[in-house]
A protein has these predicted regions:
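N-terminal amphipathic, basic helical "cap/leader" segment at the start of enzyme domains
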Residues: 1-77, 84, 177-178
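Glycine/charged-rich beta-loop-alpha catalytic/anionic-binding loops adjacent to active sites
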Residues: 13-16, 88-101
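Short secondary-structure junction motifs
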Residues: 43-46, 119-122, 146
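C-terminal helix-cap and adjacent tail motif
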Residues: 3-21, 147-178
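A glycine-rich helix N-cap at a beta->alpha junction
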Residues: 68-78, 140-161
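Acidic, glycine-rich active-site loops and adjacent beta-strand->loop/helix elements
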Residues: 85-86, 130-133, 152-155
Length: 178
């Protein structure tokens, strides 16, 4: 798939086919895309935990609540992104600049994961609503959970929605030096 087409095809999926598991090789390709993504000082300060089968069914209620993410019970795979330590160089840069590179790196990683999923015909949805304490206990994670991604095949007939975004002129400037 061409990159621009991929950008238009990727959307947050909230209707998954619960009877169609995600093949392990597709999950691994998504994780590999994250491994290859850029990060501050090449630190990759995160850990990915892919959950399928019974474990995915245990994760589902931990990302639901207060009328959020009702679709989670249909999701065949969740990827939990938690923090990992910086490498020494990135840690020093973060201290000196006061910038949270880890958050930036996790955002970059998540973007790569969603695009890799779309490239393989998978739907995805980034979830910021979750019970962190219970997720960490269930998965034995030491680092703070930052994002959970739903991953799976969209239900047949789930429409591709038109993207509603501000015009580029509101988001960007192109400054030319003469």
């Amino acid at each position: 798939m061409e990159y621009q087409e991929l950008l238009h095809q990727r959307q947050s999926c909230r209707a998954y086919d619960p009877d169609r598991p995600v093949e392990q090789e597709k999950i691994l390709r998504c994780l590999e895309a994250v491994r290859l993504s850029p990060s501050a000082c090449n630190s990759q300060p995160y850990h990915l935990t892919a959950c399928t089968g019974k474990l995915a069914r245990q994760v589902a209620p931990l990302v639901q609540g207060e009328a959020h993410n009702d679709f989670a019970s249909q999701v065949p795979c969740f990827v939990v992104i938690s923090e990992a330590p910086y490498n020494p160089s990135a840690a020093m840069h973060a201290r000196v600049t006061g910038r949270d590179y880890r958050s930036m790196d996790i955002g970059i990683a998540a973007a790569h994961l969603t695009l890799a999923a779309a490239d393989q015909g998978l739907g995805s949805c980034l979830l910021g609503w979750f019970d962190e304490e219970k997720l960490r206990a269930l998965l034995g994670l030491e680092g703070e959970v930052r994002l959970v991604m739903a991953l799976g095949y969209a239900c047949p007939g789930d429409p591709l929605r038109e993207k509603v975004r501000p015009p580029l002129s509101q988001l960007a400037d192109l400054i030319e030096e003469s």
